[in-house]
Amino acid sequence: LPLILLSLLNSTAALAESLYQVEVIVFRQAATPISAGQLPPDNWAQNALPVDGSNSRTPALNAEAGKLNPSNGYEVLLHKAWAQSLGESISRAAISAGDEQFGHFPIEGTIGLKGGRVIELESDIWVNQIDTSGTIADSERIKQSSRLTSGELTFVDNGSLGMLIRVSPL
């Protein structure tokens, strides 16, 4: 009996953590930029796993990103896809776009996800205006918590910025 219970616990733990494809599009809406009133911290990545060659995936939302063009009043700032394990505790991925200067990127932030019946999202994305000396002059921010349904495209609105996110099982 103890062996059966142990094997059930191990299989439950294995099921509790599953691999997902996460795809994010961060874009600017036609509105005037709204300052966050603060600059991103130097530790903006907060020990999150970076999205790099080891976990990046081919984006699938290219048609949706294509509709977010200047003639429609939008500008895509970041479009990335990656593989991420989701379980009972939140796991964070660090995303960025543009050239790094003094530890910061023009677009940088974290996407935190927690699995379960619904997927819990904690987004903290900074869109930085970097001056000619390489320092951040001002920033916009998307900091929101949401609940996502697996496989569904979700829109996160934040005034002058928006984000589309889809989390699908692999």
How should each PLM-predicted stretch be described?
Residues L9-A13:
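N-terminal signal peptide c-region/cleavage motif recognized by signal peptidases
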Residues L1-L5:
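Sec-dependent N-terminal signal peptides
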Residues E23-I25, L164-S168:
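Soluble periplasmic/extracytoplasmic beta-strand elements of cell-envelope proteins
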